[in-house]
């Protein structure tokens, strides 16, 4: 029995959450897309915010995210893959754009690597009415954020290098997920563990769920399905089965 399965039997499983990234969506029809995602039964919708500086791509401004709100009531989250300057100067706009229709906090994820004043950024997200969360790139050790774990609602483990969709999953990130889950349990923290990158309804989501993650960001792994509902249902089923101990093996 793996260490993660021992933790599962201890009753520490958190509800599975399926969070599609709209990066591979048809941007010209984003309103219809987020509405369809809501009807598919997703738990949140993620907007990958890129500034061409921290990562080599440009994506969504706060106005576009806010414009999508009138098409659905699903909670939003923004992953700020931006430089420290852009994060701090645009933070209030993104926190507000991510909120629910009635001002409910949206998840706002700051990258540890981009923010030398991470404590200040996370505190400001909370003060502005958001749900502060932190992301770690594949090369970044968990040790870097242990001192701010009591400030966050979510930790996002990148299982690809950020910047573009459709990249290959990095399986060695499973050890980082296990390390974070053990820390969360040891310190009795109310923190969800997210994974992002190469997440599909087979061994990748299965092994991440077994390692201790409960929130799964899927882009091409969900949009490749004939319908978004089929993608959502398959992802959720495989992750839930892994929490029960039915874990899929990596193909050889």
Predicted segment positions?
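N-terminal amphipathic alpha-helix/helix-capping segment at the start of soluble metabolic enzymes
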Residues: 1-24, 31-32, 246-252
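Active-site-adjacent beta->alpha loops and helix N-cap segments on the catalytic face
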Residues: 2-9, 27-29, 53-67, 84-91, ...
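Hydrophobic faces of well-ordered beta-strands that scaffold small-molecule active sites
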Residues: 16-22, 45-47, 68, 76-80, ...
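Conserved, mostly hydrophobic/aromatic
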Residues: 30, 37, 48, 94, ...
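Catalytic cores of alpha/beta
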Residues: 34, 86-97, 140-151, 198-216
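Structural motif
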Residues: 40, 71, 96-103, 128, ...
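Glycine-rich phosphate-binding active-site loops on the catalytic face of alpha/beta enzymes
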Residues: 102-108, 113-114, 156-167, 211-232
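C-terminal helical cap(s) of enzyme catalytic domains, especially alpha/beta-barrels
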Residues: 209, 224-252
């Amino acid at each position: 029995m793996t260490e993660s399965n021992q933790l599962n039997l201890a009753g520490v499983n958190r509800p599975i959450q399926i969070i599609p990234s709209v990066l591979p969506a048809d941007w010209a029809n984003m309103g219809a897309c987020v509405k369809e995602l809501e009807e598919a039964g997703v738990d949140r919708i993620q907007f990958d915010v890129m500034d061409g500086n921290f990562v080599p791509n440009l994506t969504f401004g706060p106005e576009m995210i806010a414009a999508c709100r009138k098409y659905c009531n699903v909670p939003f989250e923004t992953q700020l893959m931006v430089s420290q300057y852009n994060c701090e100067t645009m933070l209030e706009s993104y926190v507000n754009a991510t909120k629910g229709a009635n001002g409910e906090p949206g998840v706002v994820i700051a990258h540890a690597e981009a923010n030398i004043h991470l404590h200040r950024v996370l505190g400001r997200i909370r003060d502005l009415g958001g749900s502060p969360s932190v992301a770690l790139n594949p090369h970044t050790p968990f040790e870097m954020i242990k001192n701010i774990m009591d400030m966050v609602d979510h930790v996002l483990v990148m299982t690809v290098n950020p910047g573009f969709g459709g990249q290959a999953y990095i399986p060695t990130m499973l050890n980082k997920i296990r390390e974070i889950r053990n820390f969360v349990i040891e310190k009795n923290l109310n923190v969800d563990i997210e994974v992002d990158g190469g997440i599909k309804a087979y061994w990748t989501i299965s092994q991440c769920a077994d390692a201790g993650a409960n929130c799964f960001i899927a882009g091409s792994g969900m949009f490749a399905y004939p319908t978004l509902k089929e993608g959502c249902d398959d992802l959720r089923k495989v992750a839930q089965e892994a929490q029960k101990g039915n874990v899929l093996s990596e193909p050889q």
